[in-house]
């Protein structure tokens, strides 16, 4: 009899939970329509994989790319709508969040064609790769719109789990296994640190989890200047630092870049930074509103260390992927300047603009590395010597992307950095901007060193890898060329296009 009553109570509770979830999805589902498109694409991929004996590979790529493009279209149609909070305060929809979601979707859309030839040559499992990419994209999008501590913790974990699986995708590669182990261990440690910081924030605010309610809770409990908030700030900064990978939280980055499959590195190098930047701006700007001086100081230290260490260590690297790893550490230092400035002097707009250009510059560079690596089997910088004599298009496009990363005019990277540094200068960050300018000059040195190797014309300096260089017979080569062309064009946008981009970015502020 007791078991019968308990069973009935369980059924009633389960039904009540199901009806509540259905009610939320029915009335709030429109607010996550772009995410729902990706979920539908994931279901289609699973259905095709489980029902088809012979995998229809073109359909898998088509479904993945189409779901990403449709999700971008849904975001654009929703542009300029009024900010809304849905799912009982767990999710917020506004222009600021949506532009970061757009950047993540753009990264994934460009990374899929970039990966086609690599997957075919290495015979990687296609369906699982696409599933992990789409799921990581979904986690990044939910992180951008997260409005409470639980969602801010769960969403990046979804992204991180897929990242661990992608980094170790080539199971027979010892370097890939080592990279995955380091990535997993440090990722788990950083998540523990992050949730510990959240617990201090939760307790200090009187048990609130929504970002704005935390501010109100801190006012009610008079804990906004307490030591508990300082402890929470330190732990949360360390936890988010792992996702952004500034110095000194950068130890995992070079090993993961070097050991992971190159298309995976291309994907992680941009999406993780975009998602973490979106989360950092909201966490620091809202719950830690009363501790702005403290978190400004912490981020300034991280930015200075990142710009100096990242660019100086990059000079000594012999692996192209490790060089780009340290370069990305320096680049995130520039992005942090925009986070510190905030929306008072156009900091967020300049940060968003620079990240848009960084996506194009970085993915364009990785597209060329994927293409060169598949034809030569090497990642050593010296093995690029004389590439211009064999493949002028690849050499010139790689040179343009590297010059844009270095910030040489009239390329997009120059105008992105110029606007970012100008906003920092107007905000009074003179020392930080000066460090940024000096380290940018350092970065130009090691980028030009690679370009000099590319353009070497003397036979005695051309390596055997380039001498035996062969173009790919695969038709999928067209897809990587498409990604490369799009990225190169975006990397070489002249300054005349800066004003409309800045104006659009300004509309994304809170």
Swiss-Prot record:
Substrates-to-products reaction catalysed: a plastoquinone + NADH + (n+1) H(+)(in) = a plastoquinol + NAD(+) + n H(+)(out); a plastoquinone + NADPH + (n+1) H(+)(in) = a plastoquinol + NADP(+) + n H(+)(out)
Its membrane topology: Multi-pass membrane protein
Gene Ontology CC entries for this record: chloroplast thylakoid membrane
Short name of any one Pfam family annotated for the protein: Ndh2_N
Example GO biological process: ATP synthesis coupled electron transport
Keyword vocabulary terms for this entry: Chloroplast, Membrane, NAD, NADP, Plastid, Plastoquinone, Quinone, Thylakoid, Translocase, Transmembrane, Transmembrane helix, Transport
Chief site of localization: plastid
Top-rank EC class of the record's enzyme: translocase
Subcellular location: Plastid, Chloroplast thylakoid membrane
Transmembrane intervals: 24-44, 57-77, 99-119, 124-144, 149-169, 183-203, 227-247, 295-315, 323-343, 347-367, 395-415, 418-438, 482-502
InterPro entries hit by this protein: NADH-Q_OxRdtase_suN/2, ND/Mrp_TM, Ndh2_N
The keyword Chloroplast is assigned to this record: yes
Entry keyword annotation includes Hydrolase: no
An annotated Gene Ontology molecular function: quinone binding
EC number of the protein: 7.1.1.-
Superkingdom of origin: Eukaryota
Family: Belongs to the complex I subunit 2 family.
Record note on quaternary structure: NDH is composed of at least 16 different subunits, 5 of which are encoded in the nucleus.
PANTHER family: NADH DEHYDROGENASE
The protein's name in its UniProt record: NAD(P)H-quinone oxidoreductase subunit 2 A, chloroplastic
């Amino acid at each position: 009899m007791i078991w019968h009553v308990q069973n009935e109570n369980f059924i009633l509770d389960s039904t009540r939970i199901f009806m509540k979830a259905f009610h939320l999805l029915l009335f709030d589902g429109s607010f996550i329509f772009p995410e729902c498109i990706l979920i539908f694409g994931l279901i289609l991929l699973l259905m095709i994989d489980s029902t088809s004996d012979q995998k229809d590979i073109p359909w898998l790529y088509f479904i993945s790319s189409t779901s990403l493009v449709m999700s971008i279209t849904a975001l654009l149609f929703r542009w300029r709508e009024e900010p809304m909070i849905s799912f009982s305060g767990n999710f917020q929809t506004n222009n600021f969040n949506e532009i970061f979601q757009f950047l993540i979707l753009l990264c994934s859309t460009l990374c899929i064609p970039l990966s086609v030839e690599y997957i075919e040559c290495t015979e990687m499992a296609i369906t699982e790769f696409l599933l992990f990419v789409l799921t990581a994209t979904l986690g990044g999008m939910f992180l951008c719109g997260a409005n409470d501590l639980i969602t801010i913790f769960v969403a990046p974990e979804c992204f991180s789990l897929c990242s661990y699986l992608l980094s170790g995708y080539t199971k027979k590669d010892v370097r890939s296994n080592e990279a995955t182990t380091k990535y997993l261990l440090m990722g788990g440690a950083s998540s523990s640190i992050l949730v510990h910081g959240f617990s201090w924030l939760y307790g200090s605010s009187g048990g609130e989890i929504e970002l704005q309610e935390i501010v109100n809770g801190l006012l009610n409990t008079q804990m906004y200047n307490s030591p508990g908030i300082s402890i929470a700030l330190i732990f949360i900064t360390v936890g988010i630092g792992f996702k952004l990978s500034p110095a000194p939280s950068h130890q995992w980055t070079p090993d993961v870049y070097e050991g992971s499959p190159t298309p995976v590195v291309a994907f992680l190098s941009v999406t993780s930074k975009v998602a973490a930047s979106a989360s950092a701006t909201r966490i620091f700007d809202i719950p830690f509103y009363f501790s702005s001086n403290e978190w400004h100081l912490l981020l300034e230290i991280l930015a200075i260390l990142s710009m100096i260490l990242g660019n100086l260590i990059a000079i000594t690297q012999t692996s192209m992927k490790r060089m780009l790893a340290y370069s990305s550490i320096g680049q995130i230092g520039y992005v942090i300047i925009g986070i510190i400035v905030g929306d008072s002097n156009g900091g967020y707009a300049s940060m968003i603009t620079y990240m848009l250009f960084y996506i194009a510059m970085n993915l364009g560079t990785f597209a060329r590395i994927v293409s060169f690596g598949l034809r030569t089997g090497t990642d050593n910088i010296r093995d690029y010597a004389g590439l211009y004599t064999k493949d002028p298009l690849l050499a010139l496009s790689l040179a343009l992307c590297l010059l844009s990363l270095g910030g040489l005019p009239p390329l997009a990277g120059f105008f992105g950095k110029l606007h970012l540094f100008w906003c920092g200068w107007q905000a009074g960050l003179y020392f930080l901007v000066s460090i940024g300018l000096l380290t940018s000059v350092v970065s130009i040195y090691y980028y030009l060193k690679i370009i000099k190797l590319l353009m070497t014309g003397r036979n005695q300096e051309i390596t055997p890898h380039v001498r035996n260089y062969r173009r790919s017979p695969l038709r999928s080569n067209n897809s990587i060329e498409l990604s490369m062309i799009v990225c190169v064009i975006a990397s070489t946008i002249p300054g005349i296009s800066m004003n409309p981009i800045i104006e659009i970015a300004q509309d994304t502020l809170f």
